[in-house]
């Protein structure tokens, strides 16, 4: 991310007072405050209420498996509760029209857009170069947002980034990001085609064909692992 873009993002966060503002949901039970519900009943039941705050989690699966729909549902729920959310979208793949129809309130969402994947300068199959730079910028933007605080849910969409490119990032990248949000009210979620990283207290929601999902904690697949995600919630 160019220095001017970094400066602008930091200025924007300060202007909106998101660099020190904590999300407001104090009237909820203590346990509920530390979870971000996905809004999908069967999945939230398996998650014991939702995605844990203060941790790095992931939603993974092939294209059209419903991975993005799970996240959009969580974003919609968070904004409806009055929380600020953020999406780091390095390849500009997000569909705001569909998200708005699903209930996402864009007045409460910071959308950080990278260069469109359709651009001649970006190739989803390239091994290095522009795509790697897009990923590096996305990680820098993610770090700035997490450092700012005040977000209930922060998502980075790496679903269309080749795993070979993602694996070039040092694993310490994810460790450092988790340390930023550890103990905070922010849940950070990675979207990927395959598992990328999660903190010890985070979860992996693994989507499969037929809108089936399974939840993985502490490197173990939970018993009764498959949860049916309704088609309406996994349409994108």
Residue ranges and their predicted role:
Residues 37-40, 53, 68, 132-140, ...:
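Amphipathic alpha-helical transducer elements in NTP-driven molecular machines
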Residues 75, 142, 185-188:
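Amphipathic alpha-helical interface segments used for dimerization/assembly
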Residues 170-174, 178-236:
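Phosphate-binding/switch region of NTP-binding enzymes
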Residues 62, 73, 81-164:
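Conserved inter-motif catalytic segment of the P-loop NTP-binding fold
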Residues 1-87, 101-104, 121-131, 135, ...:
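Detector for small/aliphatic-rich hydrophobic stretches
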Residues 161-166, 197-199:
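Short, solvent-exposed loop/turn segments at secondary-structure junctions
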Residues 57-59, 86-88, 110-112, 189, ...:
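Hydrophobic/aromatic beta-strand patches that form the interior of the parallel beta-sheet core
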